[in-house]
Amino acid sequence: MSNSIVIQTNSTVIEDMKQQYKHSLSPKTPQGGIFMAKVPSCTITAYKSGKVMFQGGRAEAEAARWQTGSQTPKTAVKKAVDSHRYTPPASIGTMSIVGSDEVGTGDFFGPMTVVAVYVDAKQIPLLKELGVKDSKNLNDEQITAIAKQLLHVVPYSSLVLHNEKYNELFDKGNNQGKLKALLHNKAITNLLAKLAPTKPEGVLIDQFTQPDTYYKYLAKQKQVQRENVYFATKGESVHLAVAAASILARYSFVKQFNELSKKAGMPLPKGAGKQVDIAAAKLIQKLGKERLPEFVKLHFANTEKAFRLLK
Protein backbone atom coordinates (compact mmCIF):
# COMPACT_ATOMS: atom_id res chain seq x y z
CA MET A 1 0.00 0.00 0.00
CA SER A 2 1.26 3.49 -0.85
CA ASN A 3 1.98 5.75 2.13
CA SER A 4 2.05 9.52 2.45
CA ILE A 5 4.05 11.27 5.16
CA VAL A 6 4.51 15.01 5.71
CA ILE A 7 7.23 16.58 7.87
CA GLN A 8 7.72 20.25 8.75
CA THR A 9 11.29 21.49 8.44
CA ASN A 10 13.27 24.60 7.46
CA SER A 11 14.90 26.08 4.36
CA THR A 12 18.40 24.96 5.33
CA VAL A 13 17.37 21.31 5.58
CA ILE A 14 15.35 21.59 2.36
CA GLU A 15 18.50 22.82 0.59
CA ASP A 16 20.40 19.85 2.04
CA MET A 17 17.64 17.57 0.73
CA LYS A 18 17.70 19.14 -2.71
CA GLN A 19 21.47 18.56 -2.84
CA GLN A 20 21.06 14.95 -1.67
CA TYR A 21 18.39 14.24 -4.32
CA LYS A 22 19.97 16.34 -7.09
CA HIS A 23 20.36 13.34 -9.39
CA SER A 24 16.71 12.35 -8.97
CA LEU A 25 15.03 15.76 -9.43
CA SER A 26 11.88 15.92 -11.54
CA PRO A 27 11.53 18.72 -14.11
CA LYS A 28 8.00 19.27 -12.77
CA THR A 29 7.46 21.24 -9.55
CA PRO A 30 3.94 21.75 -8.13
CA GLN A 31 2.60 25.21 -7.31
CA GLY A 32 4.26 26.50 -4.15
CA GLY A 33 6.93 23.83 -4.46
CA ILE A 34 10.72 24.12 -4.28
CA PHE A 35 11.54 20.75 -5.82
CA MET A 36 10.19 17.29 -6.57
CA ALA A 37 12.42 14.23 -6.62
CA LYS A 38 11.71 10.61 -7.50
CA VAL A 39 13.77 7.81 -5.97
CA PRO A 40 12.91 4.09 -6.01
CA SER A 41 9.45 3.61 -4.41
CA CYS A 42 9.20 7.19 -3.15
CA THR A 43 8.39 10.68 -4.44
CA ILE A 44 9.61 13.63 -2.37
CA THR A 45 8.04 17.08 -2.74
CA ALA A 46 9.34 20.10 -0.80
CA TYR A 47 7.24 23.25 -0.43
CA LYS A 48 8.07 26.90 0.33
CA SER A 49 5.99 26.55 3.50
CA GLY A 50 8.67 24.21 4.90
CA LYS A 51 6.52 21.11 4.48
CA VAL A 52 8.03 18.08 2.76
CA MET A 53 5.80 15.27 1.51
CA PHE A 54 7.01 11.69 1.03
CA GLN A 55 4.76 9.40 -1.04
CA GLY A 56 5.17 5.74 -1.95
CA GLY A 57 6.10 2.38 -0.50
CA ARG A 58 9.33 3.73 1.02
CA ALA A 59 7.83 7.00 2.27
CA GLU A 60 8.30 6.15 5.94
CA ALA A 61 11.91 5.01 5.52
CA GLU A 62 12.82 8.00 3.35
CA ALA A 63 11.16 10.50 5.73
CA ALA A 64 12.97 8.92 8.68
CA ARG A 65 16.30 9.91 7.11
CA TRP A 66 15.36 13.56 7.58
CA GLN A 67 13.29 13.57 10.75
CA THR A 68 16.19 13.21 13.19
CA GLY A 69 17.55 16.68 13.79
CA SER A 70 15.67 18.16 10.84
CA GLN A 71 12.41 19.19 12.46
CA THR A 72 13.99 21.90 14.55
CA PRO A 73 12.86 25.50 15.03
CA LYS A 74 14.84 28.18 13.20
CA THR A 75 16.47 29.28 16.43
CA ALA A 76 18.00 25.81 16.91
CA VAL A 77 19.34 25.77 13.35
CA LYS A 78 20.78 29.26 13.81
CA LYS A 79 22.58 28.06 16.92
CA ALA A 80 24.03 25.07 15.05
CA VAL A 81 25.43 27.28 12.31
CA ASP A 82 26.37 30.42 14.23
CA SER A 83 27.62 28.90 17.48
CA HIS A 84 31.25 29.76 18.25
CA ARG A 85 31.86 26.01 18.53
CA TYR A 86 31.33 25.57 14.81
CA THR A 87 31.90 28.83 12.96
CA PRO A 88 35.55 29.34 11.99
CA PRO A 89 37.26 32.36 13.56
CA ALA A 90 37.91 35.27 11.21
CA SER A 91 41.64 34.54 11.35
CA ILE A 92 41.36 30.86 10.34
CA GLY A 93 42.81 31.48 6.87
CA THR A 94 46.23 32.15 8.43
CA MET A 95 46.13 29.37 11.05
CA SER A 96 47.81 25.93 11.09
CA ILE A 97 44.87 23.55 10.70
CA VAL A 98 43.56 20.22 9.46
CA GLY A 99 41.06 20.43 6.60
CA SER A 100 38.88 17.61 5.24
CA ASP A 101 36.80 17.10 2.11
CA GLU A 102 35.13 14.29 0.18
CA VAL A 103 34.72 13.33 -3.48
CA GLY A 104 32.54 10.81 -5.32
CA THR A 105 29.24 11.32 -3.52
CA GLY A 106 27.47 12.45 -6.68
CA ASP A 107 28.95 9.82 -8.99
CA PHE A 108 26.96 6.65 -9.71
CA PHE A 109 30.11 4.70 -10.61
CA GLY A 110 33.10 4.70 -8.30
CA PRO A 111 33.81 4.92 -4.58
CA MET A 112 33.57 7.72 -2.05
CA THR A 113 36.93 9.17 -1.03
CA VAL A 114 37.64 11.38 1.99
CA VAL A 115 40.96 13.05 2.76
CA ALA A 116 42.15 15.09 5.74
CA VAL A 117 45.22 17.32 5.29
CA TYR A 118 47.32 19.30 7.76
CA VAL A 119 48.67 22.62 6.50
CA ASP A 120 51.06 24.58 8.69
CA ALA A 121 50.58 28.34 8.35
CA LYS A 122 54.15 28.62 7.02
CA GLN A 123 53.21 26.33 4.10
CA ILE A 124 50.33 28.48 2.82
CA PRO A 125 52.49 30.53 0.35
CA LEU A 126 53.98 27.27 -1.03
CA LEU A 127 50.52 25.75 -1.56
CA LYS A 128 49.42 28.87 -3.41
CA GLU A 129 52.52 28.59 -5.60
CA LEU A 130 51.66 24.95 -6.35
CA GLY A 131 48.25 26.09 -7.61
CA VAL A 132 46.16 24.62 -4.80
CA LYS A 133 42.49 25.56 -5.10
CA ASP A 134 39.13 23.77 -5.13
CA SER A 135 39.43 20.56 -7.17
CA LYS A 136 36.16 21.34 -8.98
CA ASN A 137 38.01 24.12 -10.81
CA LEU A 138 40.78 21.78 -12.00
CA ASN A 139 40.78 19.06 -14.65
CA ASP A 140 42.09 15.54 -13.99
CA GLU A 141 45.50 16.33 -15.50
CA GLN A 142 45.95 19.39 -13.24
CA ILE A 143 44.72 17.41 -10.23
CA THR A 144 47.33 14.70 -10.84
CA ALA A 145 50.18 17.19 -11.28
CA ILE A 146 49.37 19.15 -8.10
CA ALA A 147 48.50 16.05 -6.04
CA LYS A 148 51.82 14.35 -6.79
CA GLN A 149 53.61 17.37 -5.31
CA LEU A 150 51.22 17.68 -2.36
CA LEU A 151 51.83 14.06 -1.33
CA HIS A 152 55.42 15.02 -0.46
CA VAL A 153 54.58 18.37 1.12
CA VAL A 154 51.67 17.89 3.55
CA PRO A 155 50.76 15.23 6.13
CA TYR A 156 47.45 13.59 5.18
CA SER A 157 45.07 10.70 5.77
CA SER A 158 43.19 9.22 2.82
CA LEU A 159 40.20 6.87 3.02
CA VAL A 160 38.33 5.05 0.25
CA LEU A 161 34.87 3.54 0.71
CA HIS A 162 34.58 1.04 -2.14
CA ASN A 163 31.22 0.40 -3.75
CA GLU A 164 30.51 -3.04 -2.28
CA LYS A 165 31.11 -1.80 1.28
CA TYR A 166 29.23 1.44 0.54
CA ASN A 167 26.16 -0.51 -0.60
CA GLU A 168 26.40 -2.88 2.35
CA LEU A 169 26.48 0.01 4.85
CA PHE A 170 23.71 1.87 3.00
CA ASP A 171 21.49 -1.23 3.14
CA LYS A 172 21.97 -1.28 6.92
CA GLY A 173 20.28 2.11 7.19
CA ASN A 174 23.28 4.43 6.91
CA ASN A 175 22.42 7.32 4.59
CA GLN A 176 25.11 9.07 2.57
CA GLY A 177 25.33 11.92 5.10
CA LYS A 178 26.18 9.47 7.89
CA LEU A 179 28.75 7.66 5.75
CA LYS A 180 30.43 10.99 5.00
CA ALA A 181 30.47 11.91 8.70
CA LEU A 182 32.03 8.56 9.64
CA LEU A 183 34.76 8.90 7.01
CA HIS A 184 35.55 12.54 7.83
CA ASN A 185 35.84 11.74 11.54
CA LYS A 186 38.03 8.68 10.84
CA ALA A 187 40.36 10.55 8.45
CA ILE A 188 40.74 13.43 10.92
CA THR A 189 41.35 11.04 13.83
CA ASN A 190 43.98 9.12 11.83
CA LEU A 191 45.77 12.32 10.84
CA LEU A 192 45.79 13.78 14.37
CA ALA A 193 47.38 10.53 15.61
CA LYS A 194 49.99 10.78 12.86
CA LEU A 195 50.74 14.42 13.76
CA ALA A 196 51.16 13.90 17.52
CA PRO A 197 52.67 15.58 19.45
CA THR A 198 52.07 18.46 17.01
CA LYS A 199 48.62 19.88 17.75
CA PRO A 200 46.80 21.83 15.00
CA GLU A 201 45.08 25.09 15.92
CA GLY A 202 41.83 23.73 14.57
CA VAL A 203 40.00 21.36 12.23
CA LEU A 204 37.88 22.66 9.33
CA ILE A 205 35.33 20.36 7.71
CA ASP A 206 33.82 21.26 4.35
CA GLN A 207 30.23 21.41 5.59
CA PHE A 208 27.80 18.92 4.04
CA THR A 209 25.19 18.87 6.83
CA GLN A 210 24.30 20.76 10.00
CA PRO A 211 27.03 20.32 12.66
CA ASP A 212 24.53 18.96 15.21
CA THR A 213 23.42 16.35 12.68
CA TYR A 214 27.07 15.50 11.96
CA TYR A 215 27.64 14.71 15.63
CA LYS A 216 24.40 12.71 15.87
CA TYR A 217 25.72 10.54 13.06
CA LEU A 218 28.82 9.88 15.19
CA ALA A 219 26.93 9.15 18.43
CA LYS A 220 28.07 5.50 18.59
CA GLN A 221 31.70 6.12 17.67
CA LYS A 222 34.39 5.65 20.31
CA GLN A 223 36.62 8.44 19.02
CA VAL A 224 34.95 11.68 17.95
CA GLN A 225 36.92 14.86 17.31
CA ARG A 226 35.21 17.85 18.92
CA GLU A 227 37.96 20.21 20.07
CA ASN A 228 38.32 23.31 17.86
CA VAL A 229 36.32 21.66 15.06
CA TYR A 230 34.74 24.13 12.64
CA PHE A 231 32.34 23.76 9.73
CA ALA A 232 32.06 25.98 6.65
CA THR A 233 30.37 25.59 3.29
CA LYS A 234 32.82 26.16 0.42
CA GLY A 235 35.57 25.38 2.93
CA GLU A 236 38.21 25.40 0.18
CA SER A 237 37.84 29.19 -0.02
CA VAL A 238 38.16 29.50 3.79
CA HIS A 239 41.48 27.65 4.16
CA LEU A 240 43.88 25.97 1.73
CA ALA A 241 43.91 22.84 3.93
CA VAL A 242 40.40 22.04 2.66
CA ALA A 243 41.41 22.87 -0.92
CA ALA A 244 44.41 20.53 -0.59
CA ALA A 245 42.15 17.82 0.87
CA SER A 246 39.78 18.33 -2.06
CA ILE A 247 42.62 17.82 -4.56
CA LEU A 248 43.99 14.69 -2.88
CA ALA A 249 40.48 13.24 -2.52
CA ARG A 250 39.86 13.86 -6.23
CA TYR A 251 43.24 12.36 -7.12
CA SER A 252 42.43 9.22 -5.14
CA PHE A 253 38.96 9.04 -6.69
CA VAL A 254 40.30 9.34 -10.26
CA LYS A 255 42.88 6.57 -9.61
CA GLN A 256 40.20 4.28 -8.17
CA PHE A 257 37.83 5.17 -11.01
CA ASN A 258 40.40 4.25 -13.65
CA GLU A 259 41.02 0.90 -11.93
CA LEU A 260 37.27 0.29 -11.88
CA SER A 261 37.06 0.98 -15.63
CA LYS A 262 39.81 -1.60 -16.20
CA LYS A 263 37.94 -4.09 -14.03
CA ALA A 264 34.76 -3.43 -16.02
CA GLY A 265 36.62 -3.84 -19.30
CA MET A 266 35.00 -0.67 -20.61
CA PRO A 267 35.23 3.09 -20.01
CA LEU A 268 32.93 4.20 -17.19
CA PRO A 269 31.50 7.75 -17.23
CA LYS A 270 31.52 10.03 -14.20
CA GLY A 271 28.47 11.80 -12.79
CA ALA A 272 24.92 10.52 -12.84
CA GLY A 273 23.52 11.59 -16.21
CA LYS A 274 21.95 9.64 -19.07
CA GLN A 275 25.32 8.36 -20.33
CA VAL A 276 25.73 6.67 -16.95
CA ASP A 277 22.42 4.80 -17.36
CA ILE A 278 23.56 3.53 -20.77
CA ALA A 279 26.98 2.44 -19.44
CA ALA A 280 25.36 0.66 -16.48
CA ALA A 281 22.99 -1.20 -18.81
CA LYS A 282 25.97 -2.32 -20.92
CA LEU A 283 27.82 -3.42 -17.79
CA ILE A 284 24.85 -5.52 -16.64
CA GLN A 285 24.72 -7.20 -20.06
CA LYS A 286 28.47 -7.79 -20.00
CA LEU A 287 29.04 -9.02 -16.42
CA GLY A 288 25.57 -9.78 -15.05
CA LYS A 289 23.43 -7.87 -12.56
CA GLU A 290 24.93 -9.69 -9.57
CA ARG A 291 28.24 -7.84 -10.11
CA LEU A 292 26.70 -4.37 -10.31
CA PRO A 293 27.28 -3.63 -6.57
CA GLU A 294 31.05 -3.78 -7.21
CA PHE A 295 30.83 -0.75 -9.49
CA VAL A 296 27.93 1.52 -8.50
CA LYS A 297 26.02 3.16 -5.67
CA LEU A 298 22.85 1.09 -5.91
CA HIS A 299 20.47 3.57 -4.24
CA PHE A 300 20.92 6.11 -7.07
CA ALA A 301 17.97 6.38 -9.47
CA ASN A 302 20.39 5.35 -12.24
CA THR A 303 20.08 1.70 -11.14
CA GLU A 304 16.39 1.59 -11.97
CA LYS A 305 16.95 3.54 -15.20
CA ALA A 306 19.66 1.11 -16.34
CA PHE A 307 17.41 -1.91 -15.83
CA ARG A 308 14.61 -0.09 -17.65
CA LEU A 309 16.89 0.29 -20.69
CA LEU A 310 17.34 -3.49 -20.78
CA LYS A 311 13.62 -4.23 -21.07
Swiss-Prot record:
Q: What cofactors does this protein use?
A: Mn(2+); Mg(2+)
User: Mind telling me which GO cellular component terms the entry cites?
Assistant: cytoplasm; ribonuclease H2 complex
What does the cofactor field's note say? Manganese or magnesium. Binds 1 divalent metal ion per monomer in the absence of substrate. May bind a second metal ion after substrate binding.
The entry's localization annotation reads: Cytoplasm
Q: Tell me the GO BP annotations in alphabetical order.
A: DNA replication, removal of RNA primer; mismatch repair
The reply on keyword Phosphoprotein is no
Domain of life of the native organism: Bacteria
In this chain, a divalent metal cation is annotated as bound at 101-102, 206
EC number from the UniProt entry? 3.1.26.4
Q: Which family is this protein grouped under? A: Belongs to the RNase HII family. RnhC subfamily.
Output the NCBIfam families linked to this UniProt entry: rnhC
Q: What is this protein called?
A: Ribonuclease HIII
Give the species this sequence originates from.
Bacillus cereus (strain ZK / E33L)
Taxonomic placement = Bacteria, Bacillati, Bacillota, Bacilli, Bacillales
